[in-house]
C-alpha cells in the first residue's frame, strides 16, 4: 500500500482530489454533497494564543475590538479558516488586520511562542503547545462558532479497498481523538 500525503488549503486538497492525485481529501465542512461524499471527522474551535510572557492579561476576557487591536498572526488570506474568521468579525462590525500572515498552522504557534503577537489557531491542532504551556489561550467575551473537518471523496467514485479501510480507521479514531474535558477554549458571558 502506497500512502501519499499532500498538504494545503481546503481548496488545494479538493483540487488534488479532482486531479486524481489523492483518493481522499480532508477539508472544511462547506463542501457540495452533489460533488463529494462527505464524512464528518471532527469539530474544531478557533482560539487566540500568545506566549506566556506576552504583554497581555490572560485572566481578562477580551472583546473582538480588543483582539483586533493586537498584532495578529493569522493564516494567509486564501485559507478557509482565515476567511471564516474575517467573516465572523465583519458580521460583528470589526475588521481584523494581521501583522503577519502565514501558510502553516505550526508557524502560527511558533511565532506566537516567541512573542511576535497573538495568533489565531485551531485549538484541536494546538494541544501540544497548550499542554506544554509554551502558548496560552486568551479569554474572550465572544465565541466563534465551531467548524467541521470533513473527509471527502468524489461522488460516484468507489474508493479502493485500502482507501476505504483508511477512511474507516480515521472515522473510528476520531471518536476517541479529542477529549473536550481538556479543552483550552475559554469564553465568558
Label each region the model flagged.
Residues 1-5, 90-99:
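A local structural motif
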Residues 78-90, 94, 168-189:
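Ligand-binding clefts/hinges and TM-proximal coupling segments of bilobed small-molecule sensing domains
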Residues 1-34, 102, 186:
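Central regulatory/effector-binding core of bacterial HTH transcription factors
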Residues 37-47, 132-146:
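Short beta-strand->loop
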Residues 17-18, 67, 110-116, 151:
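Hydrophobic residues within well-ordered alpha-helices
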Residues 136-180, 186:
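A late-sequence structural motif
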Residues 35-72:
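Flexible hinge/capping segments at coil-to-helix
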Residues 29-35, 91, 106-135:
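A ligand-binding cleft/hinge motif common to bilobed small-molecule-binding domains
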Amino acid at each position: 500500500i502506497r500512502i501519499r500525503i499532500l498538504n494545503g488549503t481546503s481548496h488545494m486538497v479538493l483540487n488534488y482530489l479532482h486531479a486524481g492525485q489523492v483518493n481522499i481529501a480532508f477539508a472544511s465542512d462547506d463542501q457540495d454533497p452533489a460533488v463529494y461524499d462527505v464524512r464528518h471527522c471532527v469539530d474544531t474551535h478557533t482560539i487566540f494564543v500568545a506566549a506566556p510572557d506576552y504583554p497581555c492579561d490572560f485572566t481578562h476576557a477580551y472583546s473582538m475590538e480588543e483582539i483586533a487591536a493586537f498584532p495578529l498572526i493569522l493564516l494567509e488570506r486564501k485559507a478557509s479558516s482565515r476567511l471564516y474568521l474575517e467573516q465572523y468579525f465583519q458580521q460583528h462590525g470589526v475588521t481584523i488586520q494581521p501583522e503577519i500572515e502565514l501558510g502553516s498552522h505550526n508557524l502560527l504557534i511558533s511565532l506566537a511562542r516567541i512573542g511576535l503577537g497573538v495568533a489565531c489557531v485551531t485549538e484541536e491542532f494546538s494541544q501540544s503547545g497548550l499542554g506544554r504551556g509554551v502558548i496560552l489561550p486568551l479569554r474572550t467575551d465572544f465565541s466563534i462558532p465551531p467548524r467541521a473537518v470533513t473527509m471527502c471523496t468524489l461522488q460516484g467514485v468507489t474508493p479502493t479497498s485500502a482507501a476505504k479501510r483508511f477512511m474507516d480507521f480515521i472515522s473510528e479514531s476520531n471518536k476517541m481523538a479529542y477529549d473536550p474535558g481538556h479543552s483550552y477554549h475559554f469564553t465568558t458571558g
